[in-house]
Amino acid sequence: MSYDLAVWEGELPADDGAAGEAYDQLYALYMEGEELPPTPRIRAYVLALLERWVEMTDDEHDVSPWSAGPLMDEASGPFVYFTMRYSMCEEVSAEAARMAANHGLVCYDPQWERLRPTTDE
């Protein structure tokens, strides 16, 4: 079982509903459409994640939180959709959401259909 987050460049949506609509459009465009190299901001964000947590493909001790790798392969243009192991999702998703905000990016949780980080994170 995995837990997913989507992160993208753009204006912060007004609410969770607007974020869900933006997510649906961006996912269809960038994950189901033609694959593009990640933009510089998305690339910097993914590299920051990999500075914090080991890449799944380099994980010899089962400590990587990622469910797929290489993580950079999950990015396309101004959008990245990544999965993490459910057993590590609480800590990792909260920190990944904070890191996205620090990079000026939008973070959306498609399971709970809400923007992240939340006010209690």
For the regions a language model picked out, list residue spans one by one.
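Acidic (Asp/Glu-rich) sequence patches and key acidic residues
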Residues: 1-121
